[in-house]
Regions:
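Intrinsically disordered, low-complexity proline/glycine-rich segments
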Residues: 1-158
């Protein structure tokens, strides 16, 4: 079981996320300045690039590719209708279900077991998410998936 706190910071129009484990920064996520769509680089605590979230802008539905440690980790697609807070993640067969306001999310596997939960917290500046997940190996993946759900459901461009 693992837990993360992911806090979005907006500085001079640039999006960044700080990811903490036990109140210590473990990852930083930075939106690429020049990109078509929403592309984010994920860095570990010492600045090594460990992941990428790449939005595909030519699709009818919001679609994001995930790459972690140089390996493709699948695609996440927002579901229709546009008012729902649901997404599908093809790599693990997971589904993301969100409540109507987009404040509480759960990731379930093909047998409908809950693999992770994400709760959006209301704070003054930026979005903050508390993430709990069942498999410690999914830590970096949960960073990428949480950034995707923030971009898909809480971005001003959504």
């Amino acid at each position: 079981m693992g837990n993360l706190v992911i806090h979005q910071k907006v500085k001079a129009g640039l999006e960044e996320y700080e990811v903490k484990v036990n109140n210590v920064v473990k990852y930083k996520v930075k939106k690429k300045l020049i990109a078509v769509g929403a592309d984010f680089d994920i860095f570990d605590a010492v600045g090594n690039k460990v992941g990428l979230v790449d939005q595909k802008v030519l699709n009818m539905v919001k679609t994001f590719d995930i790459t972690l440690n140089g390996q493709k980790f699948g695609t996440v697609k927002k579901e229709f209708p546009a008012l729902t807070k649901d997404m599908k993640y093809d790599y693990k067969g997971w589904k993301l279900d969100g409540d109507l306001l987009g404040m509480n999310f759960k990731f379930t596997n093909a047998s409908n077991s809950v693999m992770a939960t994400v709760q959006k917290k209301v704070v003054a500046f930026g979005d903050t998410y508390e993430v709990a997940f069942t498999d410690a190996q999914d830590e970096l993946l949960m960073v990428a998936l949480t950034v995707i759900l923030d971009e898909a459901f809480h971005s001003k461009r959504s």
